[in-house]
Regions:
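Phosphate-binding loop of NTP-binding sites
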Residues: 88-242, 248-254, 308, 370-371
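ATP-dependent carboxylate-amine ligase
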Residues: 1-12, 35-38, 289, 299, ...
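Short internal beta-strands
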Residues: 62-68, 237-242, 378-379, 402-410
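Acidic, Mg2+-coordinating active-site environments of NTP-dependent enzymes
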Residues: 7, 71-75, 184, 195-349, ...
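N-terminal leader/targeting and accessory segments in enzymes
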Residues: 1-90, 94, 245, 267, ...
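Short secondary-structure boundary segments
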Residues: 66-69, 178, 200, 408, ...
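A short, gly/pro- and small-residue-rich
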Residues: 49-62, 78-87, 194-199, 215-220, ...
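Glycine/threonine-rich flexible loop motifs
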Residues: 46-52, 185-186, 207-214, 386-389, ...
C-alpha cells in the first residue's frame, strides 16, 4: 500500500518528502523493521522512539512518523503528527483494510468482569449463528485457533493484523477486552466498535494512571470518542452498569444511545426472582425485548452482573432473547475464574484471578454465602504495581476468610517480603491472630493469618491444614501459568500446584 493512501487515514501536521512510495510493513520496534517499512517513533514510559529512528533507517525504513522534527537522510519521508500513537492506530487499520468496518465488534472495559463477560457474549453470539473471535486476558482465539495473549489488548499494529487474520479466517463477530492502558495509549483508535460495555471501576493500575479520576477518564474514552456514529456504523450502542458508582459519568459522556443493566431501580436489563446456590444462579431476565427465565452454572452475585452485561450487549447487537438465554445457560466455565480443581479430600479447591480488593471481596462474599465450613485464602499482590491496594486486599482477605495465607504473587523486581509486609499492614489493625508457619495446623483454632513467602509452600500449607468441607481459594493468578520473579517468567500454575498439593497428601 502506498504511503499516500495511508496518510488519508490521518491529519498530519507536516509531510517532508515523497508519499508516492510503497510501504511494506508498519513497525514501532526498530529491531523489527524491514526494507520498505514505515517506522513510528512512539514516546513511551521507558524509552522515546525518536532515539531509534536512526536504527530504523539503517534497517531499511523509507518513512518515519514522529511527533518531533529532526533531520532525516535524503530520500526518507518524515511525517509529523500531533499524536504518533493515534496516527499508528488509524494507519494500521487502513494498512490491513479496516477489518472491523463491516464486522460486528464489541469492546468490553472495566476493572473486573471483562473476561467473564467476553466468554458469555462469545457463547451468545455462537448461539445466534455468528462464529465469534475473542481477544482478551486469557488468550486470543477463534474456533480451534488459540494464541497466547501477551497483553489484554495488543499494540495497534499487532491488533489490526490479528483482526484482519480473524476476519479472513471466517469470524463474523469479534469480542474484545479493552484495557485502560489500551485506551490511554490509543491502541484501539483504529477500531470500528458497534458496542462498548462498561462493567465497573474499582482501584487498580494506579501505578500507571496515578489517580482514580485519570483511570476513569481512560475508560470513558471508549464511550465519549470511539462510539460516535458514522455512515459505516450508524447504530452504535453503549452498555453501562448502572449499579456502579461511576456508571452515571460513563452514561453522561457517551456519544451514542445507552442501554443500562443492573439490579438497581431503572436498569433496562435486569433480573428478578433471583436465587443463588452452590449449583449456580436462576432468575428471570427483564429486558426491553421481554421477560425470560434463565439458569446459569456460574456462582455469585458478581457473576450475575457479568451475565446481565452480556445479555445487554446481546440486545444491543439486536440478537434474539432466546439466543441470549441459550448462550448463558450453555456456558460452563471461564479459565481461572472460580475454577474448581478436583481433589479426593472432600475439600472445595477454587482458583480465581481476583487481584484487586473489590474482586477479592466479591469472590469471598460469594464463597461465604455457600460455605458450610472454614475458608482458607492463599493470596499475594503483584510487584511493580499499585502498592496502595496491598493493605486493602489484606484487610478483605482476613475479614472474609477463616485463615488468610499471605504469600508471593508476581513479585517482579520488588522484594516479596516488602510486598507481604504492606499486605500485613492492612490485617494487623483487625486484631487477628498471626500464626507462625510451624504452629499450623495444631494451633489453628480461630481466625487469623500467616505469612509464607513461597507460593508453592503456601499452597501446600493450605492443603495440609484443611479438613473435609473446607473451601480453599487460591487468588490472584487465575488462568496464568507463570510467576514473574525479577524479569523472568517461571512456569507456575495455581491449578497444577493445588492439585499436586492434595495428591502429595496421599
Amino acid at each position: 500500500m502506498q504511503l499516500a493512501t495511508l496518510l488519508q487515514a490521518i491529519t498530519p501536521l507536516k509531510v517532508d518528502g515523497a508519499s508516492e512510495m510503497e510501504i511494506q510493513g508498519l513497525y514501532y520496534d526498530s529491531r523489527q523493521v524491514v526494507p520498505g517499512g514505515l517506522f513510528f517513533a512512539l514516546k513511551g514510559v521507558a524509552a522515546d522512539g525518536h532515539r531509534f529512528i536512526g536504527s530504523a533507517l539503517q534497517a531499511g525504513a523509507v518513512a518515519v512518523v514522529a511527533e518531533d522534527e529532526g533531520p532525516v537522510p535524503s530520500g526518507v519521508t518524515r511525517v509529523i503528527v500531533a499524536d504518533a500513537r493515534h496516527a499508528m492506530s488509524r494507519m494500521a487499520a487502513a494498512f490491513y483494510g479496516n477489518p472491523t468496518a463491516h464486522l460486528p465488534l464489541v469492546g468490553i472495559t472495566g476493572t473486573n468482569g471483562k473476561t467473564t463477560t467476553t466468554y458469555l457474549l462469545e457463547a451468545i453470539l455462537e448461539e445466534a449463528g455468528k462464529p465469534t473471535a475473542v481477544l482478551g486476558t486469557v488468550n486470543y482465539r477463534f474456533r480451534e485457533r488459540v494464541f497466547p495473549a501477551p497483553n489484554t489488548t495488543p499494540e495497534s499494529v499487532d491488533l489490526q493484523r490479528t483482526l484482519r487474520e480473524l476476519a479472513d479466517a471466517g469470524a463474523q463477530a469479534i469480542v474484545m477486552e479493552v484495557s485502560s492502558h489500551a485506551l490511554e495509549q490509543k491502541r484501539v483508535d483504529g477500531c470500528s466498535f458497534d458496542v462498548g460495555v462498561f462493567t465497573n471501576l474499582t482501584r487498580d493500575h494506579l501505578d500507571y494512571h496515578v489517580t482514580m479520576d485519570a483511570y476513569l477518564a481512560s475508560k470513558v474514552r471508549l464511550f465519549a470518542e470511539l462510539l460516535a456514529s458514522d455512515p459505516v456504523k450508524p447504530r452504535r450502542r453503549a452498555v453501562v452498569n448502572s449499579d456502579d458508582p461511576h456508571g452515571p459519568a460513563v452514561i453522561a459522556a457517551s456519544v451514542c444511545p445507552v442501554i443500562t443493566y443492573g439490579l438497581g431501580a431503572g436498569a433496562e436489563v435486569t433480573a428478578e426472582e433471583v436465587s443463588f446456590s452452590v449449583t449456580g444462579i436462576t432468575g428471570v431476565f427483564v429486558t426491553p425485548a421481554g421477560r425470560m427465565p434463565f439458569r446459569s452454572p456460574m456462582l455469585g452475585r458478581f457473576n450475575l452482573a457479568n451475565i446481565l452485561a452480556a445479555a445487554a450487549a446481546g440486545l444491543a447487537l439486536e440478537l434474539p432473547l432466546d439466543a441470549i438465554r441459550r448462550g448463558i445457560e450453555g456456558h460452563k466455565q471461564v479459565p481461572g475464574r472460580l475454577e474448581r480443581v478436583e481433589n479426593d479430600r472432600g475439600v472445595t479447591l477454587l482458583v480465581d484471578y481476583a487481584h484487586t480488593g473489590d474482586a477479592l471481596e466479591n469472590v469471598l462474599t460469594t464463597i461465604r454465602e455457600i460455605a458450610t465450613d472454614r475458608i482458607v485464602t492463599v493470596f499475594g499482590c503483584g510487584g511493580d504495581r499499585d502498592p496502595g491496594k496491598r493493605p486493602i486486599m489484606g484487610r478483605v482477605a482476613a475479614e472474609l476468610s477463616d485463615l488468610a495465607i499471605v504469600t508471593s504473587d508476581n513479585p517482579r523486581t520488588e522484594d516479596p517480603a516488602t510486598i507481604m509486609t504492606q499486605i500485613r499492614d492492612g490485617i494487623v489493625p483487625l486484631g487477628l491472630a498471626e500464626y507462625r508457619r510451624e504452629e499450623l495446623p495444631a494451633a489453628y483454632a480461630g481466625k487469623g493469618f500467616v505469612m509464607v513467602e513461597s507460593r508453592r509452600d503456601a499452597i501446600r500449607l493450605a492443603a495440609r491444614i484443611v479438613r473435609p468441607g473446607d473451601i480453599v481459594l487460591l487468588a490472584g493468578k487465575g488462568h496464568e501459568d507463570y510467576q514473574i520473579i525479577g524479569t523472568t517468567k517461571h512456569h507456575f500454575d495455581d491449578r497444577e500446584e493445588g492439585a499436586a498439593a492434595f495428591r502429595e497428601l496421599g
